[in-house]
Amino acid sequence: MDSLTETTNALSNDTHAQGYQSVSTTRHVGHIREVVYDCVVEEFPVALIYNGISHAVMMTTPLDLEVFAIGFSLTEAIIDHPRQIYDIEIIKSDLGIQVEITIASEAFIKLKTHRRTLAGQTGCGICGIESLQQIQHTFPPVTHDFFVHWLDQIPDAMVQLQQQQPISAVTGGAHAAAWVVNGNILTVFEDVGRHNALDKLLGHLVKHDIDRSQGFVLMTSRASYELVKKCAQLNISLLATISAPTSLAIELAKRSGLKLASFCRQSRYVVYS
């Protein structure tokens, strides 16, 4: 991924660089009213443009957009390998942010053939898929081994995760996705959308060539279909979440061979597949 370039138009110097902003509010406690400032998580339109063609507009927290683009491109099967990304350019405007991604011609031909237009909402799952059959036919199997002792590492990792969410700590409004190896959290990404946080994490793993067979994903969200799909797409063998799974997430985790653990709180967790 060394050939990638990034143009941020001073993103690192504006208010979006921290992922939240301060707003004036009126707080009511009983009959007492006071004007106070509160921190809220940033939600910003980010257009993903492949070879000059707009593919999706995602509502995301405008941080870590290069790894977000890499992760999204892989988990949505737009590319088969990170080498198919030639360049990433990030351009900020008053309307939002454009992420212009240059991909190999064979990947672009495939994208045009299977193109879908997404209105990327914070709970977006399979919006834009042309038919129900696509859910079945495009789901990849997981081939990396799952190690049972990883389950014993979940409680300690969850404690660590609670201490490594700076955006959520001040806003209470961000999801987090973490990579756990040998019981320790190696990296965490936060976003207003759980699927965006996961794409950022997975893009980071790919960009830095981190061995995805040696750890698992831990998330502060429910386990939904799109999280299982994205993990399976990148051959992740365990997904652990703090909240409940959906029925489709369980079904597809079983079908793909991905281990799914949810309700990961304190020393408890429930294994669903």
Swiss-Prot record:
InterPro entries: Cytidine_deaminase-like (IPR016193), FdhD (IPR003786). GO terms for molecular function: sulfur carrier activity; sulfurtransferase activity. It holds the Pfam family FdhD-NarQ. It comes from the Bacteria. GO terms for cellular component: cytoplasm. Mo-bis(molybdopterin guanine dinucleotide) binds at F263, C264, R265, Q266, S267, R268. The active site is at C124. Its main location: cytoplasm. The keyword Cytoplasm applies. GO terms for biological process: Mo-molybdopterin cofactor biosynthetic process. It is found in: Cytoplasm. Gene3D superfamilies: 3.10.20.10, Cytidine Deaminase, domain 2. Keywords: Cytoplasm, Molybdenum cofactor biosynthesis. Required for formate dehydrogenase (FDH) activity. Acts as a sulfur carrier protein that transfers sulfur from IscS to the molybdenum cofactor prior to its insertion into FDH. Belongs to the FdhD family. This is Sulfur carrier protein FdhD. It comes from Acinetobacter baylyi (strain ATCC 33305 / BD413 / ADP1). The gene is fdhD.
